[in-house]
C-alpha cells in the first residue's frame, strides 16, 4: 500500500473506530480521543487501549491489557488482520472492549 494511501486509510479507520465506540452506552463515560493519529481509550480500572498507525510497517498497532498486536490491511478481505493470528482488528477490539467494560461490544 502506498504511503499516502496507507496514511489516509489508517486515519479513516481510527476515526471510524472512535465513532463506533462512542455509540455504545457501556463505553460512553470512558475517556476516548484521537491525537496525532493515536487513538487512546482508558477503562475505569485504569487499563488502556492504544491504537496507532506505524507508517514504516504499514500497520496499525494495538496496545491493550491483552498485550501488543500488529495489524496489516488485507485488501481482498477489506480488513485489518493480526500479522500473527489472522484475527481481524474488529474482532480483537470486540473482545478487548467487552472484557474492559463488562458488556458485550460488537463494532
UniProtKB/Swiss-Prot annotation:
One of its GO terms (molecular function) is ferrous iron binding. Gene3D superfamilies: Frataxin/CyaY. It holds the Pfam family Frataxin_Cyay. Signal peptide: none annotated. Keywords: Iron, Metal-binding. InterPro entries: CyaY, Frataxin/CyaY, Frataxin/CyaY_sf, Frataxin_CS. GO terms for cellular component: cytoplasm. GO terms for biological process: intracellular iron ion homeostasis; iron-sulfur cluster assembly. Belongs to the frataxin family. PANTHER family: FRATAXIN, FRATAXIN, MITOCHONDRIAL. Involved in iron-sulfur (Fe-S) cluster assembly. May act as a regulator of Fe-S biogenesis. HAMAP family: CyaY. This is Iron-sulfur cluster assembly protein CyaY.
